[in-house]
């Protein structure tokens, strides 16, 4: 590792991790990874309509990771440490990516989830250097999990 995290970066990292353990956010994260599959903005609005429990779960998950990635993008967190210990954000980005442009248009927000997007782009490069094939395997796993969820429904 070229540089070590500072004490302050490590403290903030632990605070962000502690938020992740909060019961309501854990519930939202559980819902998100079991239920959120959308290939378009319209489908996303059917899966997680605004002003519903599902919509609240969705917003809790993406806003949590958007905030964490903003801290990362502004240099408040140590990138290697974050990437080594927080890969979940990439899974969240992979789930919302197909619907993000439609959402940005619908809400006239070109920057909606842009911190998550920027961090995910860097993470993909970072992890592929260290573990070639990881992203493809993760995408295949998600595809298979989605197919199993459809069959179970």
Name what the model sees in each region.
Residues 1-153:
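Acidic, Ser/Pro/Thr-rich low-complexity regulatory regions
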């Amino acid at each position: 590792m070229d540089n070590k995290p500072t004490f302050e970066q490590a403290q903030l990292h632990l605070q962000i991790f502690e938020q992740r353990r909060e019961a309501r956010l854990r519930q939202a994260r559980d819902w998100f990874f079991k239920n959120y599959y959308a290939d378009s903005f319209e489908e996303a609005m059917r899966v997680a309509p605004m002003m519903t429990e599902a919509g609240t779960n969705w917003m809790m998950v993406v806003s949590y990771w958007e905030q964490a990635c903003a801290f990362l993008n502004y240099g408040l967190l140590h990138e290697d440490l974050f990437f080594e210990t927080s890969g979940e954000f990439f899974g969240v980005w992979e789930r919302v990516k197909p619907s993000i442009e439609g959402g940005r248009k619908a809400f006239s927000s070109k920057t909606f989830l842009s911190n998550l997007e920027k961090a995910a782009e860097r993470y993909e490069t970072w992890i592929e250097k260290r573990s070639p094939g990881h992203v493809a395997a993760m995408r295949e796993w998600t595809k298979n999990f989605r197919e199993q969820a459809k069959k179970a429904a």
